[in-house]
C-alpha cells in the first residue's frame, strides 16, 4: 500500500544519508515518525482519505530511513560466523517489541475510549440544563429509544476518536524517546 511506497522512498533516501553516521539517519527517521504521529494526533472524525494516505506514505518513509542504519549498526561489529544466530535474534526481538507496542496501543485505545464514553454519557441527562437549551442537541434527542440509540452511537464515535488520538500520542512519544536513545547510543564501534 501507501506505507510500502513510502518505505521504498525511505530506502532510496538512505543512499543519500548513508555517508553520515548511521545514528543520524535513524534520528531523521524517528523525527519523521514523530511528525507523522503529531499529524495523526490532529485528525478528527472528518479526516479525509487523502490525509490518511499521505500520512501512511510519511510513516513508510520514516521506517525506510530507520531500517537500513539500524540493520547496519546491529550487524557491523559481529563476526561472520555469528550472523545467522544474530539475524534470528534481531528479528525475534523486533517482532516481540512490535507485538508488545501494538498490544499497549490497542489497550490504550480501548481503555481511553471506554473511559471517555463513560464520562460523556454522564453529561447526557434530561436534567442537564445545557441540553434543555434550544438547538443544543442538534439532530439528537432523548425522548425515544431510537433517539437514545442514535445519541449513544455518536458518543461511541467521539469516544473512539479520543482513544485513537491517545494511541497516536503513545506512538509519537515512543518515537520521540527513540530519538533520545539514538542520540545517547554508542559511537561507531569497531570497523567504522
Enumerate the predicted regions with their spans:
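Cytoplasmic loop-to-transmembrane helix junctions
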Residues: 82-89
